[in-house]
């Protein structure tokens, strides 16, 4: 309806201009329609537009003749002659103002009819109507519709997210139900007989009598293998059991009695049960205060004990011929452990442990980038989350995208060894590459060429770390003297004592636009190699980790060290600001993952021990004693968008831990897996709707895992 109103207004406006003989306005209005509307159409519609324009001008000429305004007709040809004289369809129309009765002329009679005029108006109206319906709405006018559509898509995504997690919980429940029959079948011999379940209702003397008979039976049985050493012997009769404690202790007693029955291989367990029954009966008759009902109950208990011993002995006897030697394997039913309830997996076993009932992330997919053929050193996502830059030990740089498909955008091989890599912040098409010969190169990933190469320092040729300020105006560069140990050693020598690779170094600030050095930071107490650097969100703070185990926090407005403290025994391998930027996290050569308060120098917030495959040095073993050892160079950990979870390296893939807990060990939430070689660097991009985890390993493989976060 809105489109029809607009079309009606356009047609009415054209007719009004013709009625007042405003040829200039008519031409301008049609030119406006051509520029704003008709120019967006395909070329196949150009003949139609030209015919409509010709008919519009003829309609104007006919109107001037019908209203006896020949002067306006002559004015039309005077102004339009240069445009129309070369067009064949206008060749006969130049005589129109001079004909006495043009409506009777066979050439023009059709145009003076009412039918032709109505047909033209309807054709113009229909053409504009179809054009408005098919033409895309301008972006500014489509804002409200886009907002509504975006909100609708977000609501649908949230509904699908909840359905996905609900299905995951249902799958977990069904798997648990499938495992229960197997567990019950495996634990059938641990089922408590009635006399044990009712033991808490027996008197103290009855309980002591049952326990004494059990001990007597165990004392007469020879010990079998290591299993007997694991069964403690009771030295005194237990006291009356409370109702709350009855079932667990009763179950333990049942297990011990079963093992005791199993140990009597050379004797008939039936006779032992009969002796027990006689003993129970004798004690029952000798007690003057017992009732007849209590005596019958004890006799029933004796029968049940007899059945229990008989069943246990017969089952073990079936297994006995298969065993070789005196140390026969006991019945599996007797030592089957019940399945423990689901618990959180601790750091001691990130690959094992139970599955959490509700995972914080769902793995939507995992892809592999395999265009590197040697160990990866760095793998970083740009700030837009669309491209990845990866660098291996052979100096091969790959820039590739993964959305919607994985595709290599640029590739380069460096003649000199490369040690560091960093994306530029403002112009995210640029890469900073630090070499092992004292140079930093600025590489354009779209033009696929080096823009410039600057010489940092000849005395300190190793560019260990690069960090670009978030404002894009500058970057810091860590230069160090030659290493005491090689970066990648194929003979795998002894790594030596921690912190032995302490060499002099410098921390420099460079201008991004001019590519000139601005200043050199002071490194107290002495110049030392800086292994890792990181800015906060606005670039006002810079945190560094050095080979001497010291973390230094620099004020980038004053260009001085605000505080420093010894953080690790050995080198600091990786350091990052926390999500709220009130603390920093670090990983060191000592295998510690520590959180530090930046408002109080050296104040430790938390400390955790990480596995060696998460901190390095990383070792890849091969045939004939071949070993490849790589010292950490890239980022060893990365955070999610809210800083609640951390991604680290491992021998088989990335591992995600939950942060902020009160436990003394980190809680492992998800193991990404997928690698056959140790992972040496990670990155976590949250620029897109779904999180993207990157894990790069020593065999040159890079795994890209897409995660969907569970929103509470």
Swiss-Prot record:
Biased composition (Low complexity): 230-243
Record's subcellular location: Early endosome membrane; Late endosome membrane
Classification via InterPro entries: ARMC9_CTLH-like_dom (IPR056327), WD40/YVTN_repeat-like_dom_sf (IPR015943), WD40_repeat_dom_sf (IPR036322), WD40_rpt (IPR001680), WDR91 (IPR039724)
Protein name: WD repeat-containing protein 91
Protein source organism: Pongo abelii
Organism classification: Eukaryota, Metazoa, Chordata, Craniata, Vertebrata
Region (Disordered): 230-336
Biased composition (Basic and acidic residues): 297-308
Pfam (any one): WD40
Membrane topology reported for the UniProt record: Peripheral membrane protein
Keywords, in A-Z order: Coiled coil, Endosome, Membrane, Phosphoprotein, Repeat, WD repeat
GO cellular component: cytosol; early endosome membrane; endosome membrane; late endosome membrane
